[in-house]
């Protein structure tokens, strides 16, 4: 029983300070690969694996065709094209998205995921001063 389709959209950025949030030296990542992963609430196998690549502004769009009422769906980082900013940190590499139509959300089937980030292995030298400003 397929429900209406959804478009999941969001942005991928590089966190050069490993801050866990965007700073004035963060930048969007073009050409990053993200996947949508859905698994049952009861912890079974993850099901849907739709992938997309980010555009020049770091945005992606993934079309998904059925309702995932009984599932937890997340957008997960898969691959960074930028070798200097390609570290993935567990739990910070994903954003949960509601993919059901009965959650009172009626945005023409568009679901916005929170921005997710790749990290630099070594923070930039100027990060100490930058982070003090936040």
Swiss-Prot record:
GO terms for cellular component: extracellular space. It is found in: Secreted. Keywords: Allergen, Disulfide bond, Glycoprotein, Secreted. It comes from the Eukaryota. The keyword Glycoprotein applies. Disulfide bonds join 14-85, 17-127, 38-73. Pfam families: Pollen_Ole_e_1. InterPro entries: Allergen_Ole_e_I_CS, Pollen_Ole_e1_allergen. Glycans are attached at residue 24. This is Major pollen allergen Lol p 11. Belongs to the Ole e I family. The keyword Transmembrane helix does not apply.
């Amino acid at each position: 029983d397929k429900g209406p389709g959804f478009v999941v959209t969001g942005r991928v950025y590089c966190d050069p300070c490993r801050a866990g949030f965007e700073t004035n030296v963060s930048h969007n990542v073009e050409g990053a690969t993200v996947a949508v992963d859905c698994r049952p609430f009861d912890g079974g196998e993850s099901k849907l694996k739709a992938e997309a690549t980010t555009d020049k502004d770091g945005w992606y769009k993934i079309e998904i065709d059925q309702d995932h009422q009984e599932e937890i769906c997340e957008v997960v980082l898969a691959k960074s094209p930028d070798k200097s900013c390609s570290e993935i940190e567990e739990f910070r590499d994903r954003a949960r998205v509601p993919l059901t139509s009965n959650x009172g959300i009626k945005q023409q089937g568009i679901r916005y995921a929170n921005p997710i980030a790749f990290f630099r292995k070594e923070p930039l030298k100027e990060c100490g001063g930058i982070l003090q400003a936040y």
